[in-house]
């Protein structure tokens, strides 16, 4: 630049800094560059997403500075890639939005989406616990940026958040192969940021993330736990650019936005701009459906009772079910089995059970008998439908102990209690479990019954 061009540019920056907030100046103005002023036309290099801001907010500053330095009106041409700047006289840009020219776009680098192609909506098992999350994910995949932006999905580990993130990306890519999509964990985003800072290549990082069509960030809580203020600042700016340009953002977390205590408040606020949905652990029917789907990957026959047994053993997340199938596969392979019985499954998963080996040899009838003796009711009454208070308590305690002390599936336990549904067994189990946390006398009663059964 000539000395006069330097003077013009410095005056313009000083004026903008006086009139704009510090954050606005830092984001929209600080990293722009004056290429040249020729024939009263200033060629200014900036990111394409900032052009509209300059046209709306900087034109008056340019006009004032132009008359002060050049005693003339200075018009503007905005360019987005310095390598494409022409030596010929540029087309003028002004505030007349009815005469917009075609925008130049940066030469974007090749992007690896890092999507896992095996995760799709077709193989995601829906249940009541994830129905809203699936519906919202399908909506943003069908129309990225048009609704629910950002989409924030939270829940415990192993419940399908990563699956949904990838399913969104895979569907968008299927519908639009040219779409720029990036799946990344928050921790890897932090690592990329640190690397680009160390190499002094932040422009590359901005070019990569601020020109996406869909950004999918997994485990965003890591940004609060492990990042510096500078990392959160960069993500804040990236979020703003994408959101302002109606580009889709989807985030997952192990907690809802309000519980991200170490996250900057302005980020938490933005996370809540769109839709927040929760995924909870799958119910029994969903676990059966998940297992039925996943055993298709194995060359073994799983009878229905084995599937129901496994579904009754793990109720916290899908990863436990997947791990159980791997354990069973190992045992079946070593023994060269074709059919996985309940007994084989019980032996294979024994080490995986948190509370150690179950007493698989204890008959449910023995539990019913001891509970009946303690509460002075008959086994026949426990199995029947009579609902007097002492019988109901005895029945629920017996169901609780059958769940705790045996490896029987919920449907099998229900069958032993007069053909009751598995949901009745689960309700009884949860009720007694909750009562034990508050009722010391009940805990003593159940411990006494357990000792007699053993």
UniProtKB/Swiss-Prot annotation:
GO biological process: DNA replication initiation; regulation of DNA replication
Segments of this protein annotated with the region Domain III, AAA+ region: 114-332
Keyword Nucleotidyltransferase: no
Residues noted as binding ATP in the record, renumbered to the chain: 158, 160-162
Gene Ontology MF term list: ATP binding; ATP hydrolysis activity; DNA replication origin binding; lipid binding
Region feature Domain IV, binds dsDNA, mapped onto this chain: 333-454
One Gene Ontology cellular component: cytoplasm
Domain I, interacts with DnaA modulators: annotated span: 1-83
InterPro entries in UniProt: AAA+_ATPase (IPR003593), Chromosome_initiator_DnaA (IPR001957), Chromosome_initiator_DnaA-like (IPR020591), Chromosome_initiator_DnaA_CS (IPR018312), DnaA_C (IPR013159), DnaA_dom (IPR013317), DnaA_N_sf (IPR038454), P-loop_NTPase (IPR027417)
CDD domains found in the cross-reference section: AAA, Bac_DnaA_C
Cell compartment(s), UniProt: Cytoplasm
Keywords associated with the record: ATP-binding, Cytoplasm, DNA replication, DNA-binding, Lipid-binding, Nucleotide-binding
Listed transmembrane segments: none
Annotated region described as Domain II, given as residue ranges: 83-113
Top-rank taxon: Bacteria
Keyword Cell division part of the UniProt annotation: no
Subunit and interaction comment: Oligomerizes as a right-handed, spiral filament on DNA at oriC.
Role description: Plays an essential role in the initiation and regulation of chromosomal replication. ATP-DnaA binds to the origin of replication (oriC) to initiate formation of the DNA replication initiation complex once per cell cycle. Binds the DnaA box (a 9 base pair repeat at the origin) and separates the double-stranded (ds)DNA. Forms a right-handed helical filament on oriC DNA; dsDNA binds to the exterior of the filament while single-stranded (ss)DNA is stabiized in the filament's interior.
Free-text domain note: Domain I is involved in oligomerization and binding regulators, domain II is flexibile and of varying length in different bacteria, domain III forms the AAA+ region, while domain IV binds dsDNA.
Family assignment from sequence similarity: Belongs to the DnaA family.
Official protein name in the record: Chromosomal replication initiator protein DnaA
Organism listed in the record: Streptococcus thermophilus (strain ATCC BAA-250 / LMG 18311)
